[in-house]
Amino acid sequence: MPGLSCRFYQHKFPEVEDVVMVNVRSIAEMGAYVSLLEYNNIEGMILLSELSRRRIRSINKLIRIGRNECVVVIRVDKEKGYIDLSKRRVSPEEAIKCEDKFTKSKTVYSILRHVAEVLEYTKDEQLESLFQRTAWVFDDKYKRPGYGAYDAFKHAVSDPSILDSLDLNEDEREVLINNINRRLTPQAVKIRADIEVACYGYEGIDAVKEALRAGLNCSTENMPIKINLIAPPRYVMTTTTLERTEGLSVLSQAMAVIKEKIEEKRGVFNVQMEPKVVTDTDETELARQMERLERENAEVDGDDDAEEMEAKAED
C-alpha cells in the first residue's frame, strides 16, 4: 500500500503556545529545521536563540538530527507556511504532557491507518475522511484534541455502542472495532518489589510474620498481593493488575505498612528493589534464583542430618 498519511488533529496548523512534538531534520546557521509529527510533517524552525536559556557552547549537545523534541509554537504564518518554535520555553511539566498527548494521538493514528490498510484505501483523502468521521468527531465532542478520540476508543473496548453515532458503513465499523480491541484491550501487568524484613528480638519470627500479614491485608479484590520468601531476610512482593499506576501504589502502601509494623517491634526493614513492572524474563530469573536457594537449603539440611546421625553413632 502507498504510504498514506494524515495529520493527527482537525486543524491543519497548531496555534501559538501549543506544545508540539517535532523531529529534527537538519541544523543550519540560523537554527534547526524540524518536522511537526502531529501535523503531517509540515516544516517548522527552532531559531538558535530559542534552543536554550543558557549560552550555547555546543549545538549538538542541545539538539540532534533524528531526535524527537517537545517545543512550543511562538509564531504561525498560515499563508506562507512558516512556523517558529522554541525549545527553551517548554517547562518539564509541559514536556511530559506533550509526550503523553503525542503517544495517545499516535495510537489513534496507528489504529485508523491500519483500518485504511485493511480497507485498501489508496488516497490520503480517504484516510482524512476516516479521521473526520471518527477521531475528530470525538476530539470535537470532548473539546480535547488527541485525548478525546483516545478515550472514546478505549471506552469502545467495553462498550462498542459509543461508535454508533459515527458515519461508518458496516465494513468500516467492523474493522475499526477489531483494531481498537487489538490495540487497546488492557493487558495485565505483574508488579514486583523486593524487601528485607528481620527482627532479632525474643519474638522475632512472630514479629516478621505479623508485619508480612499486615502487608497482605492491603490486598484488594482486583489486586491480590503475594509475598514469597527468597532467602531470609529477603522477600519478594508481587501483584497482578490491569491498572499499572494503581498496582504500583498498592504495593508501595503495603510496604509502608510492613515497615511500620516491624519497626514497632524494633525490627529492620530495607527496600532491595522498589515496585516496578516486571517482564517474563525477570520472572524466569526469580524462579531460577528461588530454585537455587531451595537446593542450597536442602543441601544444608542434608549436612545437618548427616552430622546428627554421626553424633548418634558416636553415642
Swiss-Prot record:
UniProt modified residues of type Phosphothreonine: T279, T281
Q: What is its main location?
A: cytoplasm
Q: What does UniProt list under activity regulation? A: Activity is regulated by phosphorylation at Ser-49 and Ser-52, which stabilizes the eIF2/GDP/eIF2B complex and prevents the eIF2B-mediated exchange of GDP for GTP, thereby preventing the formation of the 43S pre-initiation complex (43S PIC). This results in the global attenuation of 5' cap-dependent protein synthesis and concomitant translation of ISR-specific mRNAs that contain a short upstream open reading frame (uORF) in their 5' UTR, such as ATF4, ATF5, DDIT3/CHOP and PPP1R15A/GADD34.
Q: Which InterPro entries match?
A: NA-bd_OB-fold, S1_domain, S1_IF2_alpha, TIF2_asu_C, TIF2_asu_middle_sf, TIF_2_asu
Q: Is Phosphoprotein tagged as a keyword?
A: yes
**Localization in the cell:** Cytoplasm, Stress granule; Cytoplasm, Cytosol; Mitochondrion
Query: Where are the annotated segments for Disordered?
Result: 293-315
Query: Where do Acidic residues bias regions lie?
Result: 299-308
Tell me which UniProt keywords the record has, alphabetically. Acetylation, Cytoplasm, Initiation factor, Mitochondrion, Phosphoprotein, Protein biosynthesis, RNA-binding, Translation regulation
GO CC terms of this entry: cytoplasmic stress granule; cytosol; eukaryotic 48S preinitiation complex; eukaryotic translation initiation factor 2 complex; extracellular exosome; glial limiting end-foot; membrane; mitochondrion
Which Gene3D superfamilies does this chain map to?
A: EIF_2_alpha (3.30.70.1130), Nucleic acid-binding proteins (2.40.50.140), Translation initiation factor 2, subunit 1, domain 2 (1.10.150.190)
One GO biological-process annotation of the entry reads:
HRI-mediated signaling
Q: How is it modified after translation?
A: Phosphorylation at Ser-49 and Ser-52 stabilizes the eIF-2/GDP/eIF2B complex and prevents GDP/GTP exchange reaction, thus impairing the recycling of eIF-2 between successive rounds of initiation and leading to global inhibition of translation, while concomitantly initiating the preferential translation of integrated stress response (ISR)-specific mRNAs. Substrate for at least 4 kinases: EIF2AK1/HRI, EIF2AK2/PKR, EIF2AK3/PERK and EIF2AK4/GCN2. Phosphorylation on Ser-52 by the EIF2AK4/GCN2 protein kinase occurs in response to amino acid starvation and UV irradiation.
Pinpoint the S1 motif domain residues.
Answer: 17-88
Q: Which residues carry this modification: Phosphoserine?
A: S49, S52, S158
Q: Name one GO molecular function term.
A: translation initiation factor activity
Name of one Pfam family that matches: S1
User: In its keyword annotation, does this UniProt entry include Phosphoprotein?
Assistant: yes
Instruction: Recount the UniProt induction comment for this entry.
Output: Up-regulated upon endoplasmic reticulum stress.
Q: Which residues carry this modification: N6-acetyllysine?
A: K141
Complexes and interactors = Eukaryotic translation initiation factor 2 eIF2 is a heterotrimeric complex composed of an alpha (EIF2S1), a beta (EIF2S2) and a gamma (EIF2S3) chain. eIF2 is member of the 43S pre-initiation complex (43S PIC). eIF2 forms a complex with at least CELF1/CUGBP1, CALR, CALR3, EIF2S1, EIF2S2, HSP90B1 and HSPA5. Interaction with METAP2 protects EIF2S1 from inhibitory phosphorylation. Interacts with ABCF1 isoform 2. Associates with ribosomes. Interacts with DDX3X in an RNA-independent manner. Interacts with CDC123. (Microbial infection) Interacts with rotavirus A non-structural protein 2; this interaction probably plays a role in the sequestration of IF2A in viral factories. Interacts with rotavirus A non-structural protein 5; this interaction probably plays a role in its sequestration in viral factories.
Please describe what this protein does.
Member of the eIF2 complex that functions in the early steps of protein synthesis by forming a ternary complex with GTP and initiator tRNA. This complex binds to a 40S ribosomal subunit, followed by mRNA binding to form a 43S pre-initiation complex (43S PIC). Junction of the 60S ribosomal subunit to form the 80S initiation complex is preceded by hydrolysis of the GTP bound to eIF2 and release of an eIF2-GDP binary complex. In order for eIF2 to recycle and catalyze another round of initiation, the GDP bound to eIF2 must exchange with GTP by way of a reaction catalyzed by eIF2B.
**What family does the entry list?**
Belongs to the eIF-2-alpha family.
Q: What is this protein called?
A: Eukaryotic translation initiation factor 2 subunit 1
Give the organism the record lists. Answer: Homo sapiens (Human)
Q: Which gene is this protein's source?
A: EIF2S1
